Structures are given as C-alpha cells and as structure tokens.
C-alpha cells in the first residue's frame, strides 16, 4: 500500500527489506493458493505501469534501476513510446514499465475460493453478523453482535474502511475513500485483444490514477476517480465513462453493463497500520492495494498468534498518525489535497 521510502525512513533499509521480502512471499503464495485449494480466480501474469506526463517518465527509469540495485527485483522492462502499441491501443501514454512478476486477478472469486477452503478446513464463517462493540473481559474479549455475543481469547480487527465506531482509536487513523469501477459489455475476443494485446493489467503513475484490465469474457474492467467526502457518485457509469473514453476513445459510447463501488482504507502516510495491544490485533491501512499486503499482514498476525511476533513488531514501528480533527475534518482536508494533486496531474 506504500512506496518503499516511508518504510525505509521508519525501519531503516534492513527493516524495509524484510517487509519487501514478505511482499515477495505473498506474491508467490497468491500464485499458489488457487492451485493448492482448487479454485479459479482468473489469475493472469503481467502489469504495465505507465507515465502520462514527461516529467514522470523518469520515475519509471528510477524504479527499474532501484528495484534491481537495492531490492534485488530483476526483470522489469522499460517500454518506450514507439513500443507501446504492442501493449496498449492508446495514445495517452508516453512510456511504460512492464513487470513480468506482477499479476492481476478477480478478488471476488479469490474471496469465495478462500472462504470455501477455510470451511473445508473446519473454519466457521458467520456472514451478516455485524459486531457492535467489544470489551476486555478476564483473559479475553467479549464481542457483542446483532445476533448474540462471542467470547474469545484473542481479537483480530480486520475491518479496513468499515471499522466505523467499533474502535474509535483505529478509525481515527483511517479515512474511507470511495472508489468505483465499471465493466463494459462483452467486446468480443478480437476487439478486446486489440485494446491490450498482451493481456496485462495497466495503471498509470498519476496521483489520481486509472487502472484497467480485460476479463476472461472479453470485457474491459476500468476504474478511475475517487471520492473523499463520503458516499458514491449517484451514477457511477456517468462518473467513470469520461476516464475510460479518455484512455480508449475508440470505445466511445460502449455499453457499460456493470458498475459498482465501495470504500478503501487510506492511512495518512499510505503505510499499512498493523499491530497489537495485548491480545487485540488489527490490520488496516492498505490504501487501495490490499490483495498482496493483506496476505503479508495476515501472515505476520498469524505468526504472532502462534508466538512469533518479530514481523508484527516491524509493522508496528511504522508511524500511522491520526488524521487532524478525526474523520469529520480529515475528509475535507484530503479533498483539498486531492484537488492540489489533480492539478499537478495536468502538467
């Protein structure tokens, strides 16, 4: 959820390197999970990180060099503008950096696959059982839900943007940011492949970024824009279409069959907020990049529950301050900040 400089500033190179290595483990684990547990989540390899502004092309070069030299991450390929048509049918981009180790997947299918694996292993999942509050009691915790109470020796809070009033301290360190996506009608194999010939997922390095990929049934799934002041656009299709058609003008007027949205949990420094206090654990602050960081964080918390809290202690050294004035004032401040960076995205 974070670039490496904030991690290195808090933990030093060795500490940041350990968290980086944990992310590499998570990437390998994510590749193996569907095979190990027998489910499909549309896992596909390949990510193209693009630059729109001339001054941001250098960021691609810089990361390619730093990844190899400092973090041992090899294989990144710089894609010059004259090569981009082999990757993406858009004139919007000046250059790209291809990562053959990165991947994209369907997170809903991943969630269903993992849930089924948990139940096969004897785990129990209670859906639609909202936790209202909790308190310490004896050597454990008592959690009050809408349908009854639960007693437990250890409590893990993994609520992300939906922590709300369940834990006021944690909620003050998070800002729920609305994000939304659309999926086009099926484009047909030939037309879909013409948009992204190598079937990689694409993001750009703007502050307010676009991100998109193809689906197995030849739709374009596209996200762009966000809201800091709560809620969702009244018409997600209308809000997202200009971003999509800016990238792919050849899709102007295409039917958008699906539209949905939700909230991501942004921390002030965009660093993950993971830690413990006694037998109360928490995982949050993925800031829009939760698939791999949440797996790495879950491993750290699982290890701590089993007696090894070394990695969790590293995470807990990351500084995650409260938003000034709490969420009431954080959203307007973040919206102002977003407006500033959106202006910077133009030049």
PLM features: what roles do these ranges have?
Residues 42, 76-79, 124-126, 257-259:
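General small-molecule cofactor/ligand-binding pocket signal
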Residues 16-19, 23-27, 56-60, 103, ...:
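Generic structural signal for well-ordered, non-membrane alpha-helical segments
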Residues 1-81:
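Dinucleotide-binding Rossmann-like beta1-alpha1 core, especially the glycine-rich loop
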Residues 226, 230-232, 237-346:
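C-terminal catalytic lobe of FAD-dependent flavoproteins
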Residues 9, 13-15, 40-49, 83-117, ...:
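Helix-loop-beta segment of a Rossmann-like dinucleotide-binding subdomain
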Residues 28, 36-44, 131-133, 149-278:
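Active-site substrate-recognition segment that forms the wall
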Residues 58-69, 91-153:
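Helical element adjacent to the flavin cofactor pocket in flavoenzyme catalytic cores
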Residues 77-80, 125-127, 145, 157, ...:
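General beta-strand structural signal in soluble alpha/beta enzymes
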């Amino acid at each position: 959820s974070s670039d490496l400089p904030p991690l290195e500033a808090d933990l030093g190179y060795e500490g940041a390197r350990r968290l980086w290595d944990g992310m590499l483990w998570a990437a390998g684990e994510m590749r193996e999970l569907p095979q190990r547990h027998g489910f499909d989540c549309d896992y596909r390899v390949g990510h193209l990180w693009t630059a729109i502004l001339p001054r941001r092309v250098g960021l691609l070069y810089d990361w390619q060099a730093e990844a190899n030299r400092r973090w041992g991450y090899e294989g990144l390929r710089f894609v010059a503008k004259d090569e981009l048509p082999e990757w993406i049918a858009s004139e919007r981009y000046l250059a790209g950096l291809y990562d053959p180790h990165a991947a994209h997947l369907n997170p809903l299918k991943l969630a269903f696959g993992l849930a089924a694996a948990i139940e096969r292993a004897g785990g129990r999942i209670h859906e639609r059982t909202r936790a209202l509050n909790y308190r310490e009691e004896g050597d454990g915790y008592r959690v009050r839900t809408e349908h009854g109470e639960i007693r437990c020796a250890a409590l893990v809070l993994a609520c992300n943007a939906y922590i709300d009033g369940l834990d006021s301290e944690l909620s003050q360190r998070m800002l729920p940011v609305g994000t939304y996506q659309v999926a086009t009608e099926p484009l047909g194999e030939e037309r879909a492949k013409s948009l992204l010939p190598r079937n990689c997922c694409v993001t750009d390095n703007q502050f307010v970024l676009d991100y998109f990929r193809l689906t197995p049934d030849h739709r374009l799934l596209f996200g762009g824009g966000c809201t800091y002041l709560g809620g969702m656009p009244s018409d997600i299709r209308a809000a997202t279409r200009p971003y999509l058609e800016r990238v792919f003008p050849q899709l102007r007027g295409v039917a958008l069959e699906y539209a949905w949205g939700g909230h991501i949990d942004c921390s002030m420094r965009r660093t993950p907020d993971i830690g413990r206090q006694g037998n109360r654990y928490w995982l949050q602050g993925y800031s829009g990049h939760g698939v791999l960081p949440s797996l790495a964080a879950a491993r750290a918390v699982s290890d701590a529950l089993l007696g090894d809290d070394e990695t969790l202690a590293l995470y807990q050294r990351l500084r995650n301050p409260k938003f000034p004035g709490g969420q009431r004032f954080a959203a307007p401040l973040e919206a102002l900040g977003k407006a500033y960076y959106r202006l910077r995205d133009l030049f």
